[in-house]
């Protein structure tokens, strides 16, 4: 999966590292391969996309490490030749996928293709959306919540008096890192209405109204100053889907507001989160 090494710590707080930390805590020996870092640094005239270097790296790592299980996350550049090699070694494989796949969510058709592309080459798939979105008869496909990690989500905001009331952060793309001139995120309409209706509430919002997104340690400092957070993902609310924003808010002890249409109240009670119907 993508461990974002090339971003020098800005994207350190990601799902792949949370999962790795969990595997290690359970006593497993984990070897990490950052596919997008490999293809990014190995593009040349003989390997325009860097995928040949990735294939060589994966195969050599398998030969040297001899894993019992290979866990794949958003690794779109893995070739069929590499999957055939993995199968020849009789190694169990699974994939996880955390981008939206529900109707009328960003890039949902493209994201569905990304999941289904590998579905016949892995033993199981884990999605942060209700798998029935892809069809009722899809086998070996399961829901997995966004993971939290005790070494990442270290704040206990419920134990402190915060200077801000409600925190929310978004961006125009994690890899870009900065706001894109002329781009409008559909959530801005909802947020601006929310702010206008609640003038007595102190909002701390990043990624809109000319306020740049926050990342890494700057994100942690910002989120530490609010007692509540808004969990608002792009696109139409989909059963069980949320970005990892949910983990960053609830895991750090913020009282979190969640759209009821996500049906995440199947997992959280009214004493654990606030589920809203609309702006009213």
Q: What name fits each language-model region?
A:
Residues 1-45, 51-52, 57, 65, ...:
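Nucleotide-sugar donor-binding catalytic core of glycosyltransferases
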Residues 59-70, 80-94:
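Glycosyltransferases and closely related glycan-assembly transferases
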Residues 68, 277-280:
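Short, intrinsically disordered, charge-balanced linker/junction segments flanking boundaries
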Residues 88, 272-273, 280:
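Short linear sequence elements within intrinsically disordered, low-complexity coil regions
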Residues 95-108:
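A short, histidine- and acid-enriched strand-loop-helix "catalytic/donor-clamping" loop
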Residues 98-101, 146-150, 279:
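Short, acidic/turn-prone active-site loops that include or flank metal/cofactor-
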